[in-house]
Amino acid sequence: MKNLTILGSTGSIGVSTLDVVKAYPDMFRVVALTAGNNLELLKTQIETFSPDLVSVLTAEKAQALSRSLTGKKPEIMHGVEGMIAAATASETTMVVAAIVGAAGLVPTTAAIMAGKDVALANKETLVTAGHLVMQMVREKKVNLYPVDSEHCAVFQSMAGHRSQDIARVILTASGGPFLNWGREKLQAATVADALNHPNWSMGRKITVDSATMMNKGLEVIEARWLFDIPVQRIGVNIHPQSIIHSMVEYVDGSVMAQLGTPDMKGPIAYALTYPGRVPSGVKALDLTALSGLTFFKPDTDRFPALQLAYRAADAGESMPAVMNAANEIAVEAFLGGRIGFMAIAEAIEKVMDLHEPHALASIEEVLEADRWGRRTAKEVLGVGC
């Protein structure tokens, strides 16, 4: 039996993870859960899975949660201290890192340093601190399993092959809700428009990232660290049907791909049960029902965020952390109705132009670069979000 901590249990990935866990009570036990603001859902999860420990955002929310629970209560903590306690709980053997954004970095690295295997859905951990995180993974001899559908697809497509045999990795992207929108129409895109993803059901932040194509840019950087492949050998193809989740091209010209119905329970179940497989609840793929599979190159004129991510990856050092921080602030401002859709990438570029990349030797230095990026993005945008 695997004992699990789920960081971000009330988010999209966390909820899907618990769906998988619930289907296999003889395989998994939930030791700890962490959540941000959704106390009602967390309360339901506590009643269903009986964790030993839960952590929420603030002391006030911890008190409110405690008052709402009846019967036997788990230990309730809050803040970063609570997240770290959940990530490093002695009985936990695997941590599902599903917190959105750079906030997931500290608890995820704490889990690694505590010797826990990690199912990684928080791509920002590798975007901001990839070199440090992979060094920790090697030193602690833990397993890092990708939960992003694209990286899970690459992981499966690389199985049994040597890294020197790989010519390139090709990540697929749906193109998001604005695939066929022109620049003029994009200028007037609303929050509701951006959140209307055609294929995937995800959280608000990642759905906006998909609309700008920053999500794919973050995934390029994540793949660079996960698979130790130069970013110049990681490409992106637009694939509107979201059936092929990514591909690996080998030096002999062969291409291996992983296909499946778009549903995050698939990669989650694979990460939780690797090297085995279990029925995940994902609808079986019927290729005969598809009218076709199409692919084309991304339009970086309409979606400049992807090119900004490649630029950050090429610059390296502190630039990816700063870019990610600027993106989080800009997306938050867009979701709050304070800036337009196209202003997201414009703000990120301005912040990157102001930044001089420098080496990052510790997680604290990564966090400082993150703080600089956030402060500068707020100044550039003129917002106080």
UniProtKB/Swiss-Prot annotation:
Broadest EC class? oxidoreductase
Binding sites annotated in the UniProt record for Mn(2+): D148, E150, E219
Alphabetic keyword roster? Isoprene biosynthesis, Manganese, Metal-binding, NADP, Oxidoreductase
The signal peptide annotation in the UniProt record is: none
* InterPro entries, per database record: DXP_reductoisomerase, DXP_reductoisomerase_C, DXP_reductoisomerase_N, DXPR_C, DXPR_C_sf, NAD(P)-bd_dom_sf
Required cofactors, per record?
A: Mg(2+); Mn(2+)
Q: What's one GO BP annotation on this UniProt entry?
A: isopentenyl diphosphate biosynthetic process, methylerythritol 4-phosphate pathway involved in terpenoid biosynthetic process
- GO: which molecular function terms? 1-deoxy-D-xylulose-5-phosphate reductoisomerase activity; manganese ion binding; NADPH binding
User: Does the record bear RNA-binding in its keywords?
Assistant: no
Binding of NADPH occurs at T10, G11, S12, I13, G36, N38, N122, E124, G203
The annotated pathway is: Isoprenoid biosynthesis; isopentenyl diphosphate biosynthesis via DXP pathway; isopentenyl diphosphate from 1-deoxy-D-xylulose 5-phosphate: step 1/6
The entry's function note states:
Catalyzes the NADPH-dependent rearrangement and reduction of 1-deoxy-D-xylulose-5-phosphate (DXP) to 2-C-methyl-D-erythritol 4-phosphate (MEP).
NCBIfam families given in the database record: Dxr, PRK12464.1
Question: In which family does this protein belong, per the annotation?
Answer: Belongs to the DXR family.
Q: What is this protein called?
A: 1-deoxy-D-xylulose 5-phosphate reductoisomerase
